[in-house]
Amino acid sequence: MKNDVIAARYMPAAVEALKAFPINPSRMELVMISENVTFRVTNGDDGAPYVLRLHRPGYHTLAGLNSERIWTGALAEAGIATQAPVLTHDARYFHQVDIANTGEQRYAGMTEWVEGTVISDYLGENASLEERKRCFHQIGALAATIHNQSSSWTPPAGFERPSYDSDGLLGEAPLWGRFWEHPGLDRADTVLLQRTRSQIREVLRDFQTASTNFGMIHADLDPANVLVQDGRVTLIDFDDAGYGWHLYELAAAAFAEIEKPGFPDICQALIAGYRDIRALSERDLTLLPMFLLIRGMALIGWISERPEIDNTDLFREVKEWTLASCASFKSPM
């Protein structure tokens, strides 16, 4: 769907949502349609930029969205840069609006706009292997810092976020969708995915979930969600944050590079950065290839759940790699 069509569909609701926040908008532009419909808003009083998101209906409850804000605030207190929230006039994180053109109801939330370049754009297509290794070393250290915070943090009563456990990743209703039912798969593909899914669930059944390897994670630590500006790193887009294995976090970070030259070196840099901050056992590390495969499956489900977004090329690439990995999968335990 073209951006001008999306803007026309959601702009009236965005304008209405802004009335709930202490912002005097002078300009608003659509910047992204993915999980959410995201606008950049300029405050007419001082020219400061902000982010307004209309959150995907049905993906999170209001309690879940509020919990996201609670955790990003806790991360900020621990020294991890995140986007600071903007509260409504009556001190709430979110305001519900009706989307007249679709009949939807969406929660609108605002944060400060953070200047910078996401690492995926910073690297582009022509970055050297050494530069890519340096960036992924930094991402690994960031992941470890997140996990250090979450493993020592006690969520408040009522805290609600999804769990990327065996059921959340590979159960009958995975958080990112029933990947084996994507319409672009044939029967043989589906059989292969189902068989491998069952094999991996057997492995996960024996893999402990302790504070040393499982807890609150960002869950989408893709280089596109890490901003850099003058050496400062800011983590953005916590829409998928929840409880999960730390290895899934690392797999999510590495997956974008999986078909690029030097991928083993990228993984080594990621792990080295992580181990600079937090321990990661060799036994757990042997499961990273399996978690990369889980990430591939999850992405197929994510694409299947969002037919309104043209992900034709992404689906083809992820499908090819994931099916090949399923065909060669052997239980690591």
Residue ranges of predicted features:
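Active-site acidic catalytic loop and adjacent metal/ATP-binding pocket
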Residues: 34-47, 51-52, 85, 198-247
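ATP-binding pocket architecture of kinase catalytic cores
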Residues: 42-154
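ATP/Mg2+ or Mg2+-diphosphate-binding catalytic cores
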Residues: 299-333
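Juxta-kinase regulatory segment immediately upstream of eukaryotic protein kinase catalytic domains
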Residues: 1-25
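Active-site catalytic-loop/activation-segment of kinase and kinase-like phosphoryl-transfer enzymes
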Residues: 1, 159-206
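Active-site activation/catalytic loop segments of kinase-like enzymes and analogous catalytic loops
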Residues: 246-279, 295-310
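Protein kinase glycine-rich loop
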Residues: 29-32
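All-alpha amphipathic helical-bundle segments outside canonical DNA-binding/catalytic cores
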Residues: 134, 280-292
